[in-house]
Amino acid sequence: VGTLDGFSDATSKWFSSTFATPTAAQVDGWPAIASGAHTLIHAPTGSGKTLAAFLWAIDRLAHEPTPPERERTRVLYISPLKALAHDVERNLRGPLAGIRLAATDLGVEPPQISTGMRTGDTPQRERQAMLRHPPDILITTPESLYLMLTSRAREILAPVRWVIIDEIHSIAGTKRGSHLALSLERLAAITDVEPQRIGLSATQRPLEDIAAFLGGGIPDGDRWTPRPVTIIDAPRDKALDIEIVVPVTDMTRPELSAPPGAEADDPRRKSIWPAVYPRLLDLLNAHRSTIFFVNSRGLAERLAAELNRLAGQEVVRSHHGSVSREHRIEIEDLLKRGELRGVVATSTLELGIDMAAV
């Protein structure tokens, strides 16, 4: 199963026609996942680890008998960010459509695998529809999983066999992580069989600590037995161009860099931002697509407005938690396709999102 030997003909045909070779994360990850072991895959963004996590489960869904409708949700994907959840939902469309087409070419009944998303953005009518028609693959966040486990929605989680936790390093060791750990144990208590846990991590070490968080433990009287986790370490060297730029002569005295003739009460004498804006616009113009990260929603709005003012047209848009669901998805799609020059974002875009144009 190290390459494609363990996959069905349709899945192998689609993969071989789409990719030259499997990545290291896939070559090493598939055997562990196929064995049923809880698995932590450590690999950088863009290394194919998400497909490494999903493809085995998708292949099983595609070639097993379709269960009764109330028992269809067998794959649960948990994302720490809504934007990452939307990105994964988009990225699954290609493999699912490709495997259907490959099956048709091979004269096999094409699989009809459905996906669904449950986040804080999901309208109530969609949540109710999901209870009536559960998806095969459910994409959610830690908080939404908790809400599902405490409501009637937990009934659709009983058939879950695979749980994929993306960017697990970002929540392990945090309050959100503790909350998720409890939710995973509650999930294990209500499922028909204990789900296989698959964690994806990009940057953090020691991996043993992340693996321990992923596996959790099984109560044994007054003791606690950790679940064993297989660690797949597939790092990839990546060239980074890192530069620290100070746009003023002295950050403690921004007035020294104020333009000639600026009055004493001119705002440009009291802040470094007037010197920062032109530099950021230069960087924007020098690249196809750029993401500027800031610490607050207000700063995201102000910086986007100032860059657009300097450019004389809309060249960037702001992305943060207060932007509506529709606009966030629109911005992410435009950026992903390379049709938006830049985005000023808070942490809503910081994890694992594959923006090839950036």
Predicted regions and their residues:
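Helicase motor core with emphasis on the C-terminal RecA-like subdomain
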Residues: 1-13, 21, 27-28, 34-40, ...
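Walker A (P-loop) phosphate-binding loop of ABC-type ATPase nucleotide-binding domains
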Residues: 44
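ATP-binding Walker
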Residues: 47-48
